[in-house]
Amino acid sequence: MPAAVCPLCLNNHHSVHFLQDDRRDYLQCQDCQLIFVSPEYFLSAEEEKARYDTHQNSPQDPRYRQFLNRLFLPIQQQLSPNSSGLDFGSGPGPTLSVMFEEVGHQMAIYDRFYADDPTVFDYRYDFITTSETIEHLQQPRQAFDLLWRCLKPGCLLGVM
């Protein structure tokens, strides 16, 4: 079994080989069950951004909005009017933030490539959303710790 520290629960026990495809080997943590790759398979920041630059997600795309409704609707149903939110990993065409703004919420966005403003982490929010982001992070534990610190007590973190 390969030795690797789980990037989510930080377990340093042996991980189980989960899957191999034509590009990389995947491991699974014995404790939290996270499936991850070892650092040797990480993309450089330039490679990662180049891939994201090919995404065609837009707030005007009804199919993309329908896809995001799986996260938007359950969160929206639990919010008080005029709640404040953060869309973490908003991408080149922020859409979740637009959807929440359309129904009266105040939104901040963060994306390390397209909206890299770390001052958004100086605030506390009623809700935080992150869609198609966490699975791309090299250190998801650090991201979750940061997001939890930015949430007001008892508030919502929506991950898709």
Predicted regions and their residues:
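Conserved N-terminal segment of class I S-adenosyl-L-methionine
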Residues: 1-127, 131, 144, 160
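Short conserved AdoMet
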Residues: 80, 138, 152
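A short His-aromatic
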Residues: 132, 136
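A short, conserved alpha-helix within the catalytic core of class I
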Residues: 137-147
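P-loop/Walker A phosphate-binding loop and immediately adjacent motor/lid segment at beta-alpha junctions
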Residues: 146-154
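Conserved beta-strand signature within the Rossmann-like core of class I S-adenosyl-L-methionine
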Residues: 154-160
